[in-house]
């Protein structure tokens, strides 16, 4: 694999992690508003 492939894999991984973190924070905010 060349550097571009490695970079792409890293970007894809961090993108998925970021999406998960955003989903979790949104869910937590929704839970707070429900109380």
Swiss-Prot record:
It comes from the Eukaryota. One of its GO terms (molecular function) is ATP binding. The keyword Chloroplast applies. Light regulated via thioredoxin by reversible oxidation/reduction of sulfhydryl/disulfide groups. Its EC number is 2.7.1.19. It catalyses: D-ribulose 5-phosphate + ATP = D-ribulose 1,5-bisphosphate + ADP + H(+). The lineage of its organism: Eukaryota, Viridiplantae, Streptophyta, Embryophyta, Tracheophyta. It is found in: Plastid, Chloroplast. Its main location: plastid. Pathway: Carbohydrate biosynthesis; Calvin cycle. On the 2D-gel the determined pI of this protein (spot N148) is: 5.6, its MW is: 37 kDa. This is Phosphoribulokinase. Belongs to the phosphoribulokinase family.
